[in-house]
UniProtKB/Swiss-Prot annotation:
NCBIfam families: rplD_bact. Part of the 50S ribosomal subunit. InterPro entries: Ribosomal_uL4, Ribosomal_uL4-like, Ribosomal_uL4_dom_sf. This is Large ribosomal subunit protein uL4. The keyword RNA-binding applies. Residues 56-71 have a biased composition (Gly residues). It comes from Helicobacter pylori (strain P12). Belongs to the universal ribosomal protein uL4 family. The lineage of its organism: Bacteria, Pseudomonadati, Campylobacterota, Epsilonproteobacteria, Campylobacterales. GO terms for cellular component: ribonucleoprotein complex; ribosome.
Amino acid sequence: MSKAIVLDSHLKEKGSVELPKRYEGINSHNLYLYVKHYLSSARANTAKSKNRAEVSGGGRKPWAQKGGGRARAGSITSPVFVGGGVSHGATNNRNYNLKINKKQKRLALEYALEEKAQANKLFVVEKIAIKGVVEDNKRKHLTKEANQMFQALEQRDTLFVCMNMDEYTELAFNNLKKCLVIDVSELNAYLLAAFSSVVMEEAAFQHAVQDKTEE
């Protein structure tokens, strides 16, 4: 059974906690489907080309129908002309969203957590809180404190998951390129797969692994 690594206040390993047994044997295809769903939902539908009705010009016949030796033409907005309309071009009314079932979302999240635990990249700490130093009635050195926490983990990049994230913790991690801090309500399988390691507050971990099959 896969286990998450429990860290103490100095981010040193002090134990482990098991993931629920239902996490075993989940098909990895659920994660693939969720990633496709996530990326397609985020896709901006902005690609647009003008058809022959939308390009400017073309109000008159460019040359006489007969006698010139050239192929007949009725308007310079025809797709055969340079600067004419585009045939079968991109339109901005396409829906790229891919449907995914609620159960598949849950299974994708569970598989991603299981995968991180098997790779020993899932960590649990009591609390993720960056307070900084109060100077002149302002909190300073927030990013410095967050970076020290990240460096202590010795990971390539890290996703931090809080139970109830405060604004100072969010601000502290915003300036770090290889870190992202989120509330547990924002946790999804794509983010778990995108980062090489995950650090979760104990309360956030318990919330994430609770059985949601009846919801």
